């Protein structure tokens, strides 16, 4: 059977979602053309052109690199329908009007390739009804594909089949969305708002009702329903502002229009809350309108007050007693909240009870398994646990009895009882819906295993739900060596893996020792070494706290020794006789960045943020980062002009002196921390698979470490040029005197110090300059202020 390939995608509709879906396709290097209506005035593509230009301005950016917006093809329905013929996937993302969508499908049908998949990004309209406008030949290739906003950052994509969708089409699309786009796929049934929005929006509406019942303010509720509750840090009302209150109202209307008391016993709870209507009527649509439930005025945050229709000061916090309750084990936590006397505790129990109740009643109608619900809420709403996971962790039958007691007492939002499967049969016997055999499918009455599509073979450690069986990276494979700092192990006996275990995967002397030992072992018995950790970040940098005791006891010489050891570790990585591959995900800062750039190859997750940030704590990169900048500048100059180092050096100097961090793997490549020979991976859970195979490919290709070479530096003339611009910044008040001092030291290292331009140096020479600069700063009072400020508050000190 031929492998399904997506060589080109058409996105129909250049609105907020359509344009951002196109942007994400560009991020992962999928050719895409964006369609919209022809403009009534001016160039006919101007609607699409404006949408693409707007992508460059959005924050957070939908693009890995803003300039890549220009790679999106532009088209309109009047002139360019022929471009659809070579598209393998067509994603429709126009406004949520059934009649408009049906009309568009009729228009595009004659231009579709026989093999093309057509998918609607509707957030809740019936996929089956939408398919009725398509010719019979296209219906088997039609389905729903619901991205969450913003599509670059949100993991969830829901796929929805119709009765006529070919199973292979859904399998092919799931593979592409998972591996090609880096998303978590949940298959939803064709019901209003599918899974995540059905559960999530119903939960938000219920929360708004309970807020009124218990007389709480929006700031207190957000404090209670954010990180403390294991949910998105934005809480309930800030999340609504980010989503857009008009968007939320539209999703609510979908529920109102397509459900009834007969199909949803909670239907009476779906009325538009008075506060939501009042805000929308006033034009306060949330973040995009700069006012919603909250409003920022200068540095002050205000909250809306329904009674007065005015904004009043916000910032109130929840009573700390409930913060302590929420830290207790799940079973104890829920019982404490249920028995709480104060309104905040009663409110928390009410919203949790409502979520358990709603999810259980509707599981069979909206999803195949409980796994689909919990994954949808994790990936679509930023929850650490889905509703069934929390319920199971707290004690399945105990919680079920508490919920049913509240239903019987009339305290719940609906009189609908919990389904029989909650109390009887396999779920009750297993103590929950997630087991080693699989997740509960109420329609079949069995625990159903995960889909075993080939694409999931690329995920050595998929994200598991509570109660699921599966490998855990902390104990998987064969451990070769392990201590508190690092685990050295192998999955296949061919490639060695080093996993850093310190907090934030900070690089301590023990980590360096472990890496050195791992390289020694890999050179003797393995094809390569992969540096990978199963969770984020890759590494937040050198472990300053681990260095402080030696510094206090011995003085700066201890720091110089530690820095020297880190530098030697980096050189050992670079010149190892087997390939060392760094599998980077999340933050790779300071020493973490240096660890990555000194590896033979980097395999980098799209959402990786890489940079040399030592300036923020008053230091310079001291483990080879500045040496790397100087060497790369020389290499780039050699392949370009062969003479002028300064243009290439200036880019690296600026990145280090301004502590620039790439906001994606693509931007990190522009900063020089990711090379064009490196691999960028869309899905975080495929990182280890790709890194292991990259190490094997290098080994099988006859990998040899690079030669130790001399290379030219810019010398005193280059330093003088750089210092000239720094003087202007200092005198203009853009940087402090200490910033100027640090930047001057960086300039001195990357240019090679007081030597003639073009002088040939080696890495050891530049690393000596690095150590001296680093050690001169660590005893500086202003640097010590910055270090202590960061350690105590987590925030940079500017002095």
Language-model segments: what does each one mean?
Residues 1-529, 533-536, 543-578, 585-592, ...:
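N-terminal glycine-rich phosphate-binding loop for ADP-containing cofactors
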């Amino acid at each position: 059977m031929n492998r399904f390939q997506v060589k080109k995608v058409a996105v129909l509709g250049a609105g907020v979602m359509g344009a951002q879906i196109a942007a994400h396709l560009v991020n992962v290097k999928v050719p895409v053309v964006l369609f919209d209506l022809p403009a009534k005035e001016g160039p006919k593509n101007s609607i699409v052109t404006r949408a693409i230009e707007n992508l460059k301005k959005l924050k957070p950016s939908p693009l890995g690199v803003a300039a890549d917006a220009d790679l999106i093809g532009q088209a309109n329905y009047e002139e360019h329908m022929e471009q659809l013929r070579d598209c393998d996937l067509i994603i429709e993302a126009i406004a949520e009007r059934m009649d408009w969508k049906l009309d568009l499908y009729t228009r595009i049908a004659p231009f579709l390739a026989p093999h093309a998949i057509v998918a609607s990004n509707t957030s809740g309209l019936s996929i089956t009804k939408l398919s009725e406008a398509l010719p019979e030949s296209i219906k088997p290739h039609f389905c729903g594909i619901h991205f969450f906003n913003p599509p670059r950052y949100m993991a969830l994509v829901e796929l929805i089949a119709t009765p006529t969708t070919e199973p292979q089409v859904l399998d092919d699309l799931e593979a592409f969305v998972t591996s090609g786009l880096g998303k978590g796929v949940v298959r939803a049934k064709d019901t209003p708002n599918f899974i995540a929005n059905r559960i999530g929006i119903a939960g938000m509406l219920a929360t708004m009702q309970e807020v009124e019942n218990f007389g709480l303010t929006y700031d207190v509720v957000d404090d209670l329903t954010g990180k403390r509750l294991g949910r998105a840090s934005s809480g309930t009302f800030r999340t609504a502002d980010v989503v857009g209150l008009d968007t939320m109202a539209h999703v609510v209307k979908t529920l109102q229009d397509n459900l009834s008391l007969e199909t949803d016993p909670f239907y009476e709870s779906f009325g538009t809350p008075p506060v939501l209507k009042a805000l929308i009527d006033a034009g306060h649509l949330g973040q995009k309108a700069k006012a919603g439930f909250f409003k920022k005025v200068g540095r002050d945050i205000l909250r809306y007050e329904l009674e007065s229709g005015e904004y009043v000061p916000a910032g109130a916090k929840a009573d700390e007693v409930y913060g302590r309750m929420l830290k207790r084990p799940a079973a104890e936590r829920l019982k404490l909240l249920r028995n709480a006397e104060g309104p905040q505790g009663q409110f928390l129990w009410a919203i949790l009870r409502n979520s358990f109740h709603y999810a259980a009643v509707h599981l069979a109608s909206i999803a195949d398994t409980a796994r689909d619900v919990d994954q949808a809420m994790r990936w679509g709403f930023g929850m650490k646990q889905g509703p069934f996971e929390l319920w199971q962790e707290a004690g399945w039958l105990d919680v079920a009895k508490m919920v049913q007691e509240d239903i019987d007492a009339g305290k719940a939002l609906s009189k609908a009882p919990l389904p029989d499967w909650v109390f009887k049969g396999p779920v009750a016997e297993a103590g929950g819906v997630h087991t080693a055999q699989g997740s509960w499918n109420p329609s079949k009455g069995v625990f159903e295993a995960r889909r075993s599509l080939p694409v999931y073979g690329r995920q050595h450690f998929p994200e598991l739900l509570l109660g699921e069986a599966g490998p855990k990276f902390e104990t998987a494979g064969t451990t070769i060596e392990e201590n508190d700092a690092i685990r050295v192990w192998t999955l296949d006996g061919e490639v060695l893996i080093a996993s850093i275990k310190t907090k934030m995967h900070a690089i301590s002397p023990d980590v360096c020792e472990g890496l050195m030992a791992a390289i020694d072992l890999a050179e003797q018995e393995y094809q390569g070494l992969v540096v990978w950790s199963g969770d984020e970040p890759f590494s937040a940098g050198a472990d300053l706290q681990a260095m402080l005791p030696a510094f206090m006891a011995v003085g700066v010489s201890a720091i110089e020794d530690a820095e020297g050891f880190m530098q030697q570790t980096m050189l050992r990585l670079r010149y190892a006789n087997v390939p060392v591959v760094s599998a980077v995900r999340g933050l790779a800062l300071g020493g973490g960045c240096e660890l990555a750039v000194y590896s033979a190859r980097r395999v980098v997750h799209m959402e990786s943020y890489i940079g040399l940030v030592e300036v923020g704590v008053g230091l310079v990169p001291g483990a080879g980062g500045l040496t790397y900048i100087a060497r790369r500048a020389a290499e780039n100059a050699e392949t370009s002009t062969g003479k002028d180092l300064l243009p290439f050096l200036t880019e690296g100097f600026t990145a280090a002196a301004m502590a620039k961090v790439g906001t994606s793997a693509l931007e990190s490549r522009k900063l020089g921390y990711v090379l064009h020979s490196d691999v960028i991976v869309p899905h975080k859970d495929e990182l280890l698979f790709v890194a292991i195979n990259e190490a094997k490919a290098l080994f099988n290709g006859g990998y040899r470490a690079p030669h130790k070479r001399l290379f030219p530096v810019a010398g005193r003339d280059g330093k003088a040029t750089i210092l000239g611009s720094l003087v202007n910044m200092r005198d203009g008040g853009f940087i402090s005197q200490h910033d100027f001092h640090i930047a001057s030291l960086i300039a001195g290292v990357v240019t090679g110090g007081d030597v003639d331009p073009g002088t040939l140096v080696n890495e050891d020479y530049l690393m000596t300059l690095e150590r001296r600069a680093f050690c001169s700063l660590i005893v500086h009072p202003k640097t010590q202020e910055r270090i202590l400020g960061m350690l105590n508050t987590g925030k940079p000190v500017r002095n």
